[in-house]
């Protein structure tokens, strides 16, 4: 939410503050307390739509953890920031998500997915046919189950830096995805669009 996006030094007088036990981390306290309020608001939203007749789907997710005290993450991960590798960095981008509906949909737990694939999951839950662009994303997800700004996950759940021992299949999928994504969001660039239409 906008409320939870920062900064985290507002000294808000929370009615029921949430903070890491045994520590004095004001930024962490601010974020966790605001998250609790957002969680309560989400519960209110769901309870409202539970009573509505119109079919409704709600999706809530985060894209990364907040920029709060480094000490908080060092304690959480058990390592100094200087010793973090790709696996530890990725954990700062691992956030929960939920897709809820006021009618029966397919349920799943412990799903690992990246934000770029979440739209497809939502469309399929809603029974909407995937547009061509999303169909390609679906194809990519079959070989690359998750990706973000730092790297990608292979089918065994291991994270890699881009360009790090990529197979020909993965390299080709990522290259074509980059072209398609650029065209999808920047179709006014005619030169790049020509490259897009040359893609097979």
Language-model-detected regions and their locations in the chain:
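Solvent-exposed soluble domains appended to multi-pass membrane proteins
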Residues: 1-200
């Amino acid at each position: 939410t906008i409320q939870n996006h920062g900064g985290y030094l507002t000294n808000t007088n929370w009615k029921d503050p949430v903070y890491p036990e045994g520590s004095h981390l004001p930024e962490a306290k601010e974020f966790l307390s605001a998250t609790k309020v957002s969680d309560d608001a989400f519960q209110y939203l769901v309870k409202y739509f539970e009573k509505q007749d119109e079919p409704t789907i709600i999706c809530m997710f985060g894209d990364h953890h907040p920029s709060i005290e480094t000490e908080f993450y060092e304690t959480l991960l058990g390592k100094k920031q200087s010793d973090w590798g790709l696996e530890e960095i990725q954990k700062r981008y691992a956030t929960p998500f939920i897709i809820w509906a006021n009618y029966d949909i397919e349920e799943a737990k412990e799903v690992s997915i990246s934000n770029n694939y979440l739209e497809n999951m939502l469309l399929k839950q809603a029974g909407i046919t995937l547009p061509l662009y999303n169909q390609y994303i679906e194809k990519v997800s079959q070989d690359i189950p998750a990706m973000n700004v730092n790297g990608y996950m292979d089918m065994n759940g291991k994270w890699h830096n881009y360009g790090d021992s990529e197979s020909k299949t993965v390299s080709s999928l990522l290259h074509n995805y980059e072209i398609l994504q650029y065209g999808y969001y920047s179709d006014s660039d005619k030169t790049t669009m020509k490259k897009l239409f040359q893609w097979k």
